[in-house]
A protein has these predicted regions:
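Short, well-formed alpha-helical segments that are part of the catalytic scaffolds
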Residues: 2-15, 35
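Acidic donor-binding segment of Leloir-type glycosyltransferases
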Residues: 14-57, 100
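Long helical/loop segments within the catalytic core of UDP-sugar-dependent glycosyltransferases
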Residues: 42-76, 89-174, 214-225
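The conserved acidic donor/metal-binding loop of glycosyltransferases
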Residues: 82-86, 172, 184
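Catalytic core of nucleotide-sugar-dependent glycosyltransferases
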Residues: 129-136, 211-231, 296-304, 337-339
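Acidic donor-binding loop at a coil-to-helix junction in glycosyltransferase catalytic cores
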Residues: 174-180
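Catalytic donor-sugar/metal-binding loop of nucleotide-sugar-dependent glycosyltransferases
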Residues: 181-199
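Membrane-embedded multi-pass helical conduit in multi-pass membrane proteins
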Residues: 245-343
Length: 371
């Protein structure tokens, strides 16, 4: 239940600087979530605020809820926010201006995401570096290369007509944002990066983090399998840059995380046991090449963490940057869980618990550097 977040969410949405007669805010609630529904009844009535009750049948996913809300919307733009989000008050205005300037080739602009509790513990600091690197470097790089952009799950601003024409969200995909970004690219549309920040709650609990990240990994594999069903067609639609992006970012992210622990274990075994079976299966040259990759790869990722901390002007994140290998261990656990759930519960939406932060949620974050 998101009951504790509901009143705060509405308060933050009320800070959005946009003409009220042009706003149509819809709170999407599960029909059988009686606790949150009762909390919603206590909200002060507003002409621009409505509640949509999503039927409690399978699939019980966020994209299904988004589709229900989208069916009743009439605006020219459609924006998605999560329950814990604190968007820049000028974000809607910035999105409208950006879409008008970019032209009809653009279907969506993605705002940057940051955290309002990034200093809570080591895990939230890792998460801040993770997001900081993605939204400040990787995402703009993909846009500049003309590669498909795996969208984030929140603060996406869509042209409603394009969203409708491309089929909106896949209700069975648990990373509907990444899937939609690929479908938009295949349909010939572009995605831009909006210079505006939405801050949200960084996951501060390791078990909760693994649940969330495993859902992301599972959804990435789903997305890859769906789009790779017709290789010749998808190659023609995406081009070589798009195919590289599909393989490296969509398939490669969960795959490398899953293999990471396996290769670490092999490395430790080779150095400690000197088992002849291992030596026969993996000759020394293979291990020496692997060691080069291990050293250079780790140095590159550590450098990226330090670079991101400096870019964000967050010296308090430097220690977390040097401890990133421990973060990868969590990623490995999440990837293993994702592989298991991909077989046993492919469309199960494992919800992330929110409200675990000790910091007060800011009412009015502004545009600028991701924090």
């Amino acid at each position: 239940s998101h009951e504790p977040l509901l009143a705060d969410l509405v308060e933050r949405l009320e800070t959005l600087d946009y003409p009220r007669h042009l706003l149509d805010i819809q709170l999407l609630l599960e029909a059988d979530d009686d606790e949150t529904a009762e909390a919603a009844k206590t909200l002060q009535p507003r002409d621009h605020l409505g509640i949509v009750y999503v039927p409690s049948r399978e699939p019980r996913t966020k994209p299904k809820a988004c589709n229900y809300g989208f069916l009743t919307s009439e605006g020219q733009m459609c924006t998605i926010y999560d329950a814990e989000d604190a968007p820049d008050p000028l974000q809607l205005r910035r999105a409208v201006v950006a879409m008008r300037r970019l032209g009809p080739d653009y279907a969506c602009v993605q705002a940057r995401l940051g955290f309002y509790n990034s200093d809570q513990n080591l895990l939230t600091r890792w998460f801040a570096l993770d997001y900081g690197s993605w939204f400040a470097n990787m995402l703009p790089g993909l846009v500049a290369l003309g590669a498909p952009v795996p969208l984030g799950g929140t603060s996406n601003h869509f042209r409603a007509d394009v969203l409708r024409a491309t089929g909106a969200w896949d209700p069975w995909n648990v990373t509907e944002d990444a899937d939609l970004g690929l479908r938009l690219h295949r349909a010939g549309y572009k995605v831009g990066v909006l210079d505006s920040v939405t801050r949200e709650e960084a996951n501060s609990d390791a078990i909760n983090w693994v649940r969330q990240r495993s859902r992301w990994y599972k959804g990435y594999v789903q997305t890859f399998l769906v789009h790779a069903r017709r290789p010749r067609l998808v190659t023609g639609q995406l081009g070589w840059r798009g195919i590289v992006g599909l393989v490296v970012f969509i398939a490669g992210t969960p795959l490398l995380s899953a293999l990471n622990g396996f290769f670490w274990a092999l490395t430790v075994m080779w150095f400690t046991s000197h088992d002849p079976t291992l030596a026969a299966l993996f000759p020394s040259v293979v291990y020496y090449l692997g060691m080069i990759c291990l050293v250079l790869g780790n140095l590159a990722v550590l450098y990226m963490g330090v670079f991101t901390a400096r870019q964000m002007e967050r010296p308090d994140l430097l220690l977390a940057a040097f401890l990133m290998p421990l973060y990868w261990a969590l990623m490995w656990l999440a990837a293993l869980k994702a592989v298991i759930q991909l077989v046993t519960a492919p469309s199960y939406w494992e919800k992330t618990a929110h409200g675990l932060n000790r910091a007060r949620v800011p009412a009015a974050p502004m545009a600028g550097r991701v924090a």
